[in-house]
């Protein structure tokens, strides 16, 4: 099975780390894990962040030119070497796939989408042109893999329900949790390195320190911790342009906050294993890869019940879902969690991640849907 892959928002080779880049790479890994031969068809980043129709039309022309080049390139190959399917990850009105539908039509191959979203309110206004392009791609899709179940509501009017396939968020668990360190030694090492009290509860947040929703989550977390009347320490892993704002937000809650900065991916399991509770308000997040990483490492979580967070956390079993945007409720949920049997909850989290959120499960879902279409 030969699959042409495209990520219009951010190509998998983009130099800046992000959840989007991670998921693009994971999708490629899952497809390959299932036996597919995957090639990146284009690295054109179609994202338009300003409500400028002229810029949107210019991007559409660039996409059409890229599609024409791809069609010429593929048609020059023998049929046995051409893609049998096109797969686009993360399409919405700011990042339209101007390439895939045209190539799929020209080669007469199925067109697949993952994490597509549709915003009907954008049908009018400055993004109307790009909105129409995204809608056309959604209507063209032979199947759409829904990583965030919230997207289904707006996708259902555009396509048959049978074409919507649930794809729970996933990780390459074998790589990420292959050698989980011993909790006691990991905790001792971090405590000594950063001056953290190993005998007090460790709360952990892992996120880029960015403006917008990430900063909103940090501010809500800071507000919640002001109401937490018990010992705690907060470890923050991540960095970014909003570091100063995050530092200011945390200042009123005293000296129990430790900004560890951005860490190499291979060092993250030690931090997850050493901590007691993952805490993240997840403002406006689809699901959050760090949350899934925490669960895979056996770390219970309290998270805001935004978007598809509930696809990762089984409320009361692997962690706790908190009322979105409510700092008081978030504080109460942390307080409740710290009195719970976190060891048992953590074991349940790891079991759930292993069963539903690994490459095996993702590959099975992806490959089965593609094969069904190719068999027709």
In which residue ranges do the predicted regions lie?
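Short hydrophobic beta-strand element within catalytic cores of glycosyltransferases
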Residues: 300-303
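Nucleotide-activated donor-binding/catalytic signature segment of Leloir-type glycosyltransferases, i.e.
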Residues: 244-266
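Conserved donor-binding/catalytic core segment of Leloir-type glycosyltransferases
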Residues: 196-215, 222-225
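Short alpha-helical donor nucleotide-sugar binding micro-motif in glycosyltransferases
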Residues: 262-263, 270-275
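Conserved acidic donor-binding segment of nucleotide-sugar-dependent glycosyltransferases
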Residues: 315-316, 320-327, 336-341
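Aromatic "clamp/platform" in nucleotide-sugar-dependent glycosyltransferases that forms part
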Residues: 283
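A short, histidine- and acid-enriched strand-loop-helix "catalytic/donor-clamping" loop
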Residues: 94, 111-127, 142-143
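A charged, aromatic-enriched C-terminal amphipathic alpha-helix characteristic of glycosyltransferases
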Residues: 344-370
